[in-house]
Amino acid sequence: MSSSELKNDRILRAFQRQPVDRTPVWMMRQAGRYLAEYREVRAQAGSFMGLCRSPELAARVTMQPLERYELDAAILFSDILTIPEAMGLGLNFVTGEGPVFEHRVKTAADIDRLPQPSAQKELRYVMDAVAACRKELNGQVPLIGFTGSPWTLATYMIEGGSSKTFAASKSLLFNEPEAAHRLMAKLADTVADYLNGQVEAGAQALMIFDTWGGALDPVRYREFSLAYMQRILEQLPREREGRRIPVTLFTKGGGQWLEDIADTGCDGVGLDWTTSLADARRRIGGRVALQGNLDPCMLHANPEVIRREVARCLEEFGHGPGHVFNLGHGIQPETPPENVDAMIRALHELSPAYHDATATSATS
């Protein structure tokens, strides 16, 4: 099998709104702590970043959910904070706190001193992990590469970690907008290089996680988040190995800006559970694919409830192509693995009725 041949291209077809035989599915954080086998490899690695920095181990955990479930894509096991870590901010993961940076970005001078790490140098370990994943997949399903959005990365760099209010980050936007624009531009160009490196290493689809875009007001969202995701898109290759490389933008809490997001020229728009699939399809479904949007907490319900919610999501989107089933955010560590199986089985059983029975999912 050649490196470009795929046994299952269902998700790539769905992102292009082409006919498929059933609704494709993958899950945000599908390789993670809810799986016992992941926890074993994580312990072997010694630390979270140790796991990310080992191409062999990263590829192993990337493959784990595909060994359990009939998924239509793999997503690289890594973290959105690899870029700020490579900028020298000193990333640590503290139990009960999450990511914490030793050095915060506090001033305009701090912004101007930040280096721009290269995909082929400081971040080479991520590219090696992508290549290792492609080799392990051997054409089974496509590999998704990803990054955080400039605004989301900036919040961690400015706050020094997670935040409930983003007060320091927003203060920069309000008080020093020129410095904020310099930071976003530096991050956008670094992200573009990072994603280009992932594509060169073998990623077949891309996703930009704008996790904290929904914390912004409409003016600042368009100016400091969306504009820089657009800047990234303009620097990305959109085809490789004879195939479209679909790019999905996901702004958590971004339902009010769907038209603006679709205007960027992305291929897919990620939805959280606060946005109706039916409403999103009515507004932008003629231009982009839609990804989502089961509430991750639903996977703590019993299998009958999960099946009912899968059916509701399918009914909301309706008949025809252009839907990639996913959660509305990352799967939670306490999720029972058997409930994931119940969700996927329900989707496989129920979704073919919404598609053309003559559609194919193999490489054409």
UniProtKB/Swiss-Prot annotation:
Tell me if Lyase is a UniProt keyword of this record: yes
In alphabetical order, the GO MF annotations are: uroporphyrinogen decarboxylase activity
GO CC term, one of those recorded = cytosol
> What species is given as this protein's source?
Halorhodospira halophila (strain DSM 244 / SL1)
Q: What is its EC number?
A: 4.1.1.37
GO BP terms: namely: protoporphyrinogen IX biosynthetic process from glutamate
Looking up Pfam families in the UniProt record yields:
URO-D
Pathway(s) annotated for this protein in UniProt: Porphyrin-containing compound metabolism; protoporphyrin-IX biosynthesis; coproporphyrinogen-III from 5-aminolevulinate: step 4/4
The family this protein is said to belong to: Belongs to the uroporphyrinogen decarboxylase family.
Q: What is its main location?
A: cytoplasm
- Write down the chemical reaction(s) this protein catalyses: uroporphyrinogen III + 4 H(+) = coproporphyrinogen III + 4 CO2
Name the record gives this protein: Uroporphyrinogen decarboxylase
Q: Which CDD domains match?
A: URO-D
